[in-house]
Amino acid sequence: MFKNYPLLRSLSLYRYMPYRLALTALLFLGANISIALQQFSVGQAIDHLKHAESASIFAHSFTDPQNPWFWFTVIAVIASARAIIQYLGGLSSLIIGQNLLTILREKIFKQVQDLDIKWHWKHGLGEVLTRTTRDADKLKEALINFWRQVFESTLVVLVSVGLLCYYHPLLGLVPLLFIALGLSILFHLTNKMVVLDHHVGLAYEKISDSLAENIHGIRVIKAFGLENDKSNQFRYFIQNFIQRSVDAISFGARYLPIPQIIIALLYVWVMGFGAYLISIQQLQIGQFVAALLMANMLVFRIESVGQVLHIFADARASAARIWQMLDVKPDIQDGDIEPDFRADLGLELKVEGLSIQTETGKFLLKNIQTHFKPGQIVTIVGKTGAGKTTLLNTLNRFFDPSQGRIFIGSEQQGWHDTKNLKLKSLREYVQIIPQENFFFSGTLAENLRVAKPDATPEEMTQALYLASAVELLERLEHGLDTVIGDKGVTLSGGQKQRISLARAILKDSPILALDDSTSALDAATEKNVLQRLKSMSDLKTSGPQTPKTIIINSNKQTTIALSDWIIVLDHGEIVAQGTHTDLMQNSHFYRQIMGFEQPSLSPSSAVYEEI
């Protein structure tokens, strides 16, 4: 119903705090009724004081409404009560605002986590940060001001106009017409302000994107001497943001006074018509003063609404951007099966007729048919862009195929289509080490425990040994408790890869896929790591360990030398598969990508000479 009205839709967030919402509404109701009652009491006090001029003000009891002191006491009590109620209402409103901000950011963060990899490739970090910070803050401010300005001011208008009508119908109805006319103009101007703020938001995103890229790419910037170019580009984005902001502010400064002037005319009406009513003895002096106080309050409140409409305009654009993100449905939908596979028996993957096609019709993978078995190291080779990484990313459903299916299981334990498994369960069984070695800010132990939260120091040390990273551990001043910095900034490329391997080994998933995860290792280190992984994958020697199905994306001859099976990809299709010896004898394309172009070259000796 409210999908096309993002700001109104955001009011649904109040459902998470219904009792505090009701309490805040009652407090604001009491505070605003007390304002009108206080002004009404001022008029009563003036009128009774005038009547008491010819008699002692002490002629009546202090509890007698005929005594002006009664009304002075009422005014003092109302003012004191209103101060307390307003404080409690403001405090409750502030708590609601912070709760709303927390809920918004949690929703955005969860959505970002749930969205698939493809979405993240299309949307920059700056966009996500803008939604979580600037847009969420603006929406929170609008929702708080909804209480302080819209709800509260509506109550003030209703009560004040009601009391003015009590004095005389025209004294209240004509100001109501001024208010309606002024607000209609304000709302019309708001639509233009929303468009202007949308441009401000886009300019802010450019700043966030540029800042994130320049921080993450600082090494490339320094390597190519781009400091001045990037500084000038960032300065341009800032100037563009400033100009967009000035345009929005200037528009408000030019046009917002027009409806405010119209609304201010209601004060002139109350004063002029009130004076006329006094002249014909239909209004007393005290009532006239009370009417002026109410009119003044009406002007002040409606003018403040006009000022806050700029906040609402900003928030409408921000709310639209937030809900646009929250409404995205992930392409990768969670399954509902949690199979109880026995990992110690080994798991297999069967790929049947798998194809991935882009929106333009290009095939990234086409009719892939293969079988990954436990106790084997399977290497996927091919030229750059052949589809090696894409194939690996389908195994744990980073991507879903356009056609075909992937099955996990075994003849002994049964088979399941990976689309039917819960994503968390599937990724417990299939562990992929991506090309990018990402580390969280924290210690080495904290980053290793991402794979196994309850891992002991002994288990982490053993995983580092299997990944040939134990000597790195010995060099670190505080061992496992050493802080490795944001994204592992203190580590070299090879060290990052070995720690990533150790983290995956610690996970102990039955299926392990390495996406070119040994590219930064020297030949000797890579050989040690792969031989240890091979011993883990060997069903005969694994003992109590989980027999591994190991899949590697690599063109390195060191890797191929230890492979049991090789899959050759070209333009997304399997053009050959088999052992290294068979492929060297039977596949011209394989010999080309391996660099063996002379038929007289001995395949086996050439491979091991490179190790």
Feature names for model-found ranges:
Residues A203, I207, K222-L226, S250, ...:
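Cytosolic ends of transmembrane helices, especially the final helix of ABC transmembrane type-1 domains
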Residues W71-R82, Q86, I179-L183, F187, ...:
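Hydrophobic alpha-helical segments in the permease module
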Residues H123-G126, H199-D247, I337:
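Loop segments that connect adjacent transmembrane helices in multi-pass transporters
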Residues Y16, R20-G30, N145-H199, V270-L283:
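Transmembrane helices of ABC transporter permease
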Residues R342-I611:
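ABC-type nucleotide-binding domain
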Residues L21-I85, C165-L170, Q281-I285, E411:
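Transmembrane helix-loop-helix hairpins at lipid-water interfaces of multipass membrane proteins
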Residues Y19-Q44, W71, I75, G90-S93, ...:
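Alpha-helical segments in transporter systems
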Residues Y5-P6, Y14, S93-L94, Q113-L158:
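Juxtamembrane loop-to-helix connectors within ABC transporter transmembrane domains
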